[in-house]
Amino acid sequence: MIHMLNAAAYRVKWTRSGAAKRAACLVAAAYALKTLYPILGRRLKQPGHRKAKAEDYPPAENRERLHCTEIICKKPAPGLNADFFKQLLELRKILFPKLVTTETGWLCLHSVALISRTFLSIYVAGLDGKIVKSIVEKKPRTFIIKLVKWLMIAVPATFVNSAIRYLECKLALAFRTRLVDHAYETYFANQTYYKVINMDGRLANPDQSLTEDIMMFSQSVAHLYSNLTKPILDVILTSYTLIRTATSRGASPIGPTLLAGLVVYATAKVLKACSPKFGTLVAEEAHRKGYLRYVHSRIIANVEEIAFYRGHKVEMKQLQKCYKALAYQMNLILSKRLWYIMIEQFLMKYVWSGCGLIMVAIPIITATGFADGDLEDGPKQAMVSDRTEAFTTARNLLASGADAIERIMSSYKEITELAGYTARVYNMFWVFDEVKRGIYKRTVTQEPENNSKSRGGLELPLSDTLAIKGTVIDVDHGILCENVPIITPAGEVVASSLNFKVEEGMHLLITGPNGCGKSSLFRILSGLWPVYEGVLYKPPPQHMFYIPQRPYMSLGSLRDQVIYPDSVDDMHEKGYTDRDLEHILHSVHLYHIVQREGGWDAVMDWKDVLSGGEKQRMGMARMFYHKPKYALLDECTSAVSIDVEGKIFQAAIGAGISLLSITHRPSLWKYHTHLLQFDGEGGWRFEQLDTAIRLTLSEEKQKLESQLAGIPKMQQRLNELCKILGEDSVLKTIQTAEDTS
């Protein structure tokens, strides 16, 4: 063995002791690799790297459960995989639509700040070494000069540190603005905001995706760029500086480099083996946050009904249940982070520090440029100060490099969390795009078979079971349905093959029992529901106006309520003035609210200020303002008095508006010319309306109902009299015979 060391030392010009130390390092490294590799290999193959089970965290509640028939697809859990990089590249096209953008400018400034901070760190490390050298050499003048330099360099260093954080926040805000703008454009295009909730079931909480998910994704991307770019640059530059310094002093950097590579590799393997599925956990946490917010908003939207029913206990239990599910998920993430961070800190703080001391000591001890065995006291003292300077500089550089590697490895957890946010944001844009193109899918939950613990969400593409084969054609005059069925988003056929035509000047009365498809027909005519079969000829949307039973009151002034959804500029472009709006309010008997509420510019919460009848008359005022060719009236005057209601309908007919009305009031029949009647079993009939005959039949129906209403009471009294008298009655005998048969 000694002969081998001597031969090796002679060949590479090493001393015998240096060759022995290098051989010892290589043997130790080989032994550590031989010992750790099988352990890590077994650890990676253990079932500990399983997918999260159902008992790990309870599944989030679904907003709706639909029947699943044939085609079912499973969503993969978000993680660091090919899907993540594909989704990130697709989102990059939104973040950077072209080369020269605001986001590119902030990114370049951020990169310059990160690079500047790296060079400042290297300069400060060298300056620290020179300060320590001046202390060892007892040179106060040199020490003061170096200290002043150190304080002066602190000014740009602190500015760069602050600028890095500032630019990171600006970059995150720019990303968020870009994503929000694109999301809003897509969300409000082609009535996607309606269809994504009522026609599609993949996004349970679009508000969560549009707000918090986009915010978290933007912050995570910007922070991760900062946490990866600077550390990678730090590792490259500090490694180059350390190797150059060691080589200039006559020391070999091979041993420390191999040791560093081995330690980093082993640490990465251990952390990867111990890392929980943060991407899946964070995505589930975001889902539960969104559902909790949805439950809160649901209570706010129905607060009056809940108060009337005194249902606060039920709603409180529902809220507590949702919050406990969220708290359970957050506690699960915290507990997994606790052990992961403990292992991470032990490896990166203590194991790396010990290895760092070895890596710094070996080049200094073995460097020929620091040998002082045969020197006098003066030169020996100089060598001591040089070694001190080199040790201080190398230690600072190594600490900077170790911190950079630590941040790179710690970023794995952040990357997995980013994968969760990326999956949710990408899925939101994907769903918006498909819904915009008329592709609808319903999310369903399949109960696990044989007590299976699978949590996978299942989806049924509705477009595969109900292909949209119908055609919608915009025409200038008339509404024509040719074999158009009424099919709900859940796939239920309410009415099949509607065939009718409404010309201008015709007024159609639509009747039928509840749930027969009256309002559903209006949704098809308005373009909210697709036409699955047949051909629908209808005017463009601007020539049709829908008025529901409960009109929507927007945020804004009284003027904004009348002209909704137009803006004030749109009103002026159409040639309207406030005096014209006053005439409209006179037509619907609503002008008194102008003085009562403080004029046209008064801003209030109009859904609470106006009564039910006033809100319905406001809806009719909007119809007179927009002057459509066709008005779709869905019980829109049920809270208005009959006399005022008749005047409004007469004014609408006088304005040349064709009415398609859903109403149960016989007093309005005289304002219609045709009848579309649904029977509630899928059948329908379309005919000309004879108001006189229909009113006569209605009066006869009401008379018979009133006469027959007393028969059960009379029959009961007859039975009582027969029992008291002990006699039978002919009617009682007939009834008994019927019951027996």
Swiss-Prot record:
Output a single Gene Ontology CC term carried by this record: peroxisome
Which portions of the sequence form the region Interaction with PEX19? Answer: 1-218
- The ABC transporter domain sits at 479-705
* Location (main, coarse): membrane
What topology does the record note for this protein and the membrane? Multi-pass membrane protein
Locations listed in the record: Peroxisome membrane
What family is this?
Belongs to the ABC transporter superfamily. ABCD family. Peroxisomal fatty acyl CoA transporter (TC 3.A.1.203) subfamily.
Q: What is the name attached to this protein's record?
A: ATP-binding cassette sub-family D member 2
Protein species of origin: Rattus norvegicus (Rat)
The organism's taxonomic lineage, starting at the top: Eukaryota, Metazoa, Chordata, Craniata, Vertebrata
